[in-house]
């Protein structure tokens, strides 16, 4: 299938043949949800930790005798019912990672890219290059393409410090190379702009 290419000025600049298996896949909302949740869960640190009654320091001696005081019996001052005592169901470090195999991951990315294209939220440009790190110049490119809340995806060799510096101060705008794209970044932005090189690299990765 052929897709239209735009110049950075927003004008038509030819067409590009792309793989239907990547850009014409069926929309699978359940798969996308599962992969996105798994991806975000894997980003959790899971380092929260509390101490149980056996881990809190002190409390080795019985605070008062078993009978005769009129008070409730107690064996340690580090019981959860005491101030400075341990926690009843103490949280411990854990991993929140969920297993996602390669077929599921690539299927979710294909589904997202295809839906972006079908809904008119994907734009393809010849290349994205800036000679100097100027936010004003990058903003003019965004305005010319008529996109907002946008993720720019460029080829690995196309990514440069100028692109990063020019875009980092713009709200709801991000730039990454084709290796760094993931289901979360693709669904977080309203629009996606890809260069020809990025598309070829994505196809090599997913086909």
UniProtKB/Swiss-Prot annotation:
Function: One of the primary rRNA binding proteins, this protein initially binds near the 5'-end of the 23S rRNA. It is important during the early stages of 50S assembly. It makes multiple contacts with different domains of the 23S rRNA in the assembled 50S subunit and ribosome. Forms part of the polypeptide exit tunnel.
Protein name: Large ribosomal subunit protein uL4
Organism domain of life: Bacteria
SS bonds (residue pairs): none
Keyword set, alphabetical order: Ribonucleoprotein, Ribosomal protein, RNA-binding, rRNA-binding
Coiled-coil intervals, chain numbering: none
Region (Disordered): 48-70
Family the entry assigns: Belongs to the universal ribosomal protein uL4 family.
Keyword match Mitochondrion: no
Source species of the chain: Francisella tularensis subsp. holarctica (strain LVS)
GO molecular function: rRNA binding; structural constituent of ribosome
SUPFAM superfamilies cross-referenced by the UniProt entry: Ribosomal protein L4
A GO biological-process term: translation
Xref: InterPro entries: Ribosomal_uL4, Ribosomal_uL4-like, Ribosomal_uL4_dom_sf
GO CC term (a single one): ribosome
Subunit structure and binding partners: Part of the 50S ribosomal subunit.
């Amino acid at each position: 299938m052929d897709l239209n290419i735009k110049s950075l000025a927003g004008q038509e600049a030819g067409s590009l043949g792309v793989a239907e298996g990547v850009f014409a896949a069926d929309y699978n909302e359940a798969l996308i949800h599962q992969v996105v949740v798994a991806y975000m869960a894997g980003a959790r640190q899971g380092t929260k930790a509390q101490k149980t009654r056996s881990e809190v320091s002190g409390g080795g001696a019985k605070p008062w005798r078993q009978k005769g005081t009129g008070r409730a019996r107690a064996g340690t001052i580090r019981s959860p019912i005491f101030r400075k005592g341990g926690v009843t169901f103490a949280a411990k470090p854990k991993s929140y990672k969920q297993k996602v195999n390669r077929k599921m991951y690539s299927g979710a990315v294909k589904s997202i890219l295809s839906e972006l294209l079908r809904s008119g939220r994907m734009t393809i440009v010849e290349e994205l290059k800036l000679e100097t790190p100027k936010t004003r110049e990058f903003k003019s490119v965004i305005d010319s393409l008529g996109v907002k809340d946008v993720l720019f995806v460029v080829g690995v060799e196309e990514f440069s410090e100028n692109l990063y510096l020019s875009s980092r101060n713009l709200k709801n705008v991000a730039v990454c190379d084709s290796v760094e794209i993931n289901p979360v970044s693709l669904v977080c932005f309203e629009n996606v702009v890809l260069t020809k090189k990025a598309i070829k690299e994505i196809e090599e990765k997913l086909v």
